[in-house]
Amino acid sequence: MIVTVTMNPSIDISYLLDHLKLDTVNRTSQVTKTPGGKGLNVTRVIHDLGGDVIATGVLGGFHGAFIANELKKANIPQAFTSIKEETRDSIAILHEGNQTEILEAGPTVSPEEISNFLENFDQLIKQAEIVTISGSLAKGLPSDFYQELVQKAHAQEVKVLLDTSGDSLRQVLQGPWKPYLIKPNLEELEGLLGQDFSENPLAAVQTALTKPMFAGIEWIVISLGKDGAIAKHHDQFYRVKIPTIQAKNPVGSGDATIAGLAYGLAKDAPAAELLKWGMAAGMANAQERMTGHVDVENVKKHLMNIQVVEIAK
């Protein structure tokens, strides 16, 4: 079983406008509301692929109830911890080819609610093979919270796929317990290391991933967007090349990549096939209008067209 963790979920609300007018009323009938947050995107894609998945995290108020109900309608198993404060909204206004976002900070999780979640997490990982941890931390959660989840998973011999950035990622990398896989994109890696990889990025990334902070992480997958990825498994590097596609909505493609990687791991896929599952799911997500969804037949089609090449040491 794969457990997905989303500690700061949201309702993603999208408004489509012909023109955004300031300081007046804007009306639209084209509105979508979906359960959001990186971990829930991962959840939906694993479910679309046919994987055995259960979603956990924290949900509160009417917004939390909406998310829980939407997952129930999609037949996605869930085991969230209830919190007192309201789960946030994330608003995207699509206008004139642009996207203007309004993102709420979200709820504050109390110490008692943190304890309740950790008890729930302890029970879930007893049944799990893989845990995915995605996105930001809600207010009230300590900056080393993900390190604690990784430690708990290690104790149960559960593989952790971590997709976060900034201080949350840095805290885990500096800690004694390492995730099984991380997937920063090139920009996030540059921010983490304070380096510029614009010149000769392939060689620069290879050198960077041998730094001591990455020791003990079995898989590091660096997303290069339309240029594919560079990956490191133990001491072996891989270059992943993907075909050009017509993207409809690239939002959530990184989350879909994590979902594909988790699904491949659950299938005990060998290295090259594992990377193909990740890239194929990310590509298929970009071809859907709805974030965090894939067409399985499209994923399988992409699997045939992705090249994975070992980079000579």
UniProtKB/Swiss-Prot annotation:
Alphabetized InterPro entries for the sequence: Carboh/pur_kinase_PfkB_CS (IPR002173), LacC (IPR005926), PfkB_dom (IPR011611), Ribokinase-like (IPR029056), Tagatose/fructose_Pkinase (IPR017583)
Note the PROSITE patterns from the entry.
PFKB_KINASES_1 (PS00583), PFKB_KINASES_2 (PS00584)
Which stretch is the leader sequence? Answer: none
Its EC number is 2.7.1.144
Describe the reaction catalysed, as an equation.
Answer: D-tagatofuranose 6-phosphate + ATP = D-tagatofuranose 1,6-bisphosphate + ADP + H(+)
- One Pfam entry for this protein is PfkB
What domain of life does the UniProt record list for this protein's source?
Bacteria
Q: In which pathway does it act?
A: Carbohydrate metabolism; D-tagatose 6-phosphate degradation; D-glyceraldehyde 3-phosphate and glycerone phosphate from D-tagatose 6-phosphate: step 1/2
**Per the record, what is one GO cellular component?**
cytosol
Q: Which Gene Ontology molecular function entries are recorded, alphabetically?
A: ATP binding; phosphofructokinase activity; tagatose-6-phosphate kinase activity
Give any single GO term for biological process.
Answer: lactose catabolic process via tagatose-6-phosphate
Q: Which UniProt keywords apply?
A: ATP-binding, Kinase, Lactose metabolism, Nucleotide-binding, Transferase
In its keyword annotation, does this UniProt entry include Nucleotide-binding?
yes
Q: Which family does the entry's similarity section mention?
A: Belongs to the carbohydrate kinase PfkB family. LacC subfamily.
Query: HAMAP family given for it?
Result: LacC (MF_01557)
Name the record gives this protein:
Tagatose-6-phosphate kinase
Species in which this protein is naturally found: Enterococcus faecalis (strain ATCC 700802 / V583)
